[in-house]
Amino acid sequence: MNKLFSAGALLAALLAPAPAARAQAPATPAQPWGSWVILTAQLPGGAAHRWGGYVELQGRSQALARQFFYYEAKGGVSFDIDPSVTVLVGGGHYSTSDYRALDDGPLNTEKRLWEQLVLTQYAKRLKLEHRYRIEQRWFTFRDDSTAFRQRLRYRLNAFYPLNKKTITAGTLFLSAYDELFLNPRGPVFERNRVYGGVGYQLNKHFTAQLGYLYQANFNYSGTGQVVLQNTMAKNNLVLALTYKFARRSDAPGQELLPSQQD
């Protein structure tokens, strides 16, 4: 009972920013639920081999498992400075379309680079991950116009194993995060993502996660206004499947946090 209470308190604490985010501006009328499907292959770093990396494919839909309009393919190379500090350089290609007119081609495509720092904390069962990211983004629109933007991101991710003390083979766990997106050119507070879900690590290779993600995008209603007055928000069901490659030199039962790379 104490374990379940602690896990519930953890999820409640991390999901608490969601109402606050909604309160900053009136949200648009209720929209249908969307869905995200994320497929990831990862080679984790470690004590013996500090270099790692991953590749990922992702699709997003306007409705549950249909009306897909957004696709991305990305990857990165990571280096473990020590067991609790990891740096990564990544890049990807992103495509956004009108789900009602897919034959017309993408509304815009994006090429993105980013630099990332991840700090990990372990407090008995509870694991906390702080992720800091700087992004450079090059857009090409349907009319052949282009744009360049930058963005800063911070994500606090918490993990709590339910049936073991560590997240290893055969572990059922909870995961929750809140991520802020900041735009140096404004609006400064561009986006907020709040996620809560459950996952299961089948063995040293496969992990599956299913969760709820609330995403709110904030825009100024007029140039120079300080108060955010226009909000677009959406609920999403997220399915994430991860395959981790294992090295022969990896320690048996090594704990690797099941972080989503998005």
Annotate the PLM regions.
Residues 24-86:
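Start-of-domain marker
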Residues 31-37, 69-71, 109-113, 146-154, ...:
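Residues that define the transmembrane beta-barrel architecture of outer-membrane proteins
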Residues 43, 57-63, 91-97, 121-123, ...:
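Transmembrane beta-strands of outer-membrane beta-barrel pores
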Residues 53-57, 89, 117, 130-132, ...:
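Membrane-embedded beta-strand positions of outer-membrane beta-barrel proteins
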Residues 117, 233-262:
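Outer-membrane beta-barrel "beta-signal"
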